[in-house]
Amino acid sequence: MTKTITPSSQGLDQKWYVIDATDQRLGRLACEVAKILRGKNKPTYTPHMDTGDFVIIINADKVAVTGRKSTQKLYRRHSGRPGGMKIETFEKLQQRIPERIIEKAVKGMLPKNALGRQLFTKLKVYPGPNHPHQAQKPEELTLNTIPNGDK
């Protein structure tokens, strides 16, 4: 007889967290957010279920990258038509649509299946300090994605 407890979707309490991305490192922030979305920070984590929490990221326009990535990192998209490839640097995309940078980084760290698409809908990213989710009473989560030697 097994004593393994499998959580059901009724017994899950999904919290809302708000994270300030000001001066946070992009990849390290995305990694932590992906863990929270999947529910890996909970003892009830189950790989095939959505046991994660909702995450609101504010100040997405102030996220940081190290080195020369701001000018060298490229974001590609394609319209699907011949010659429809568009390439943008991190710097230009941050000026135009800053929330897309964090969304692409987090989406790349989620599973590439139906569960990953469902988890991605629980991520809300906003370029400024305001968000429309006050009714959910999100609790502030402080992440330190800046290594000690890198100020």
UniProtKB/Swiss-Prot annotation:
GO terms for biological process, alphabetical: negative regulation of translation; translation
For this UniProt record, the keywords arranged alphabetically read as follows: Ribonucleoprotein, Ribosomal protein
Q: List GO terms (cellular component aspect).
A: cytosolic large ribosomal subunit
Q: Which Pfam families match?
A: Ribosomal_L13
* Classification via InterPro entries: Ribosomal_uL13 (IPR005822), Ribosomal_uL13_bac-type (IPR005823), Ribosomal_uL13_CS (IPR023563), Ribosomal_uL13_sf (IPR036899)
Gene3D superfamilies noted in UniProt? Ribosomal protein L13
Q: Where is this region: Disordered?
A: 126-151
Which ranges are annotated Polar residues under compositional bias?
142-151
GO MF, any single term: mRNA binding
Disulfide bridge partners, by residue number:
none
Membrane-spanning intervals of the chain: none
For this chain, the family text in UniProt reads: Belongs to the universal ribosomal protein uL13 family.
Sorted alphabetically, which NCBIfam families does this protein's record hold? rplM_bact
**Its function?**
This protein is one of the early assembly proteins of the 50S ribosomal subunit, although it is not seen to bind rRNA by itself. It is important during the early stages of 50S assembly.
Assembly and partners are described as: Part of the 50S ribosomal subunit.
Protein name per its UniProtKB record:
Large ribosomal subunit protein uL13
Taxonomic source organism: Crocosphaera subtropica (strain ATCC 51142 / BH68) (Cyanothece sp. (strain ATCC 51142))
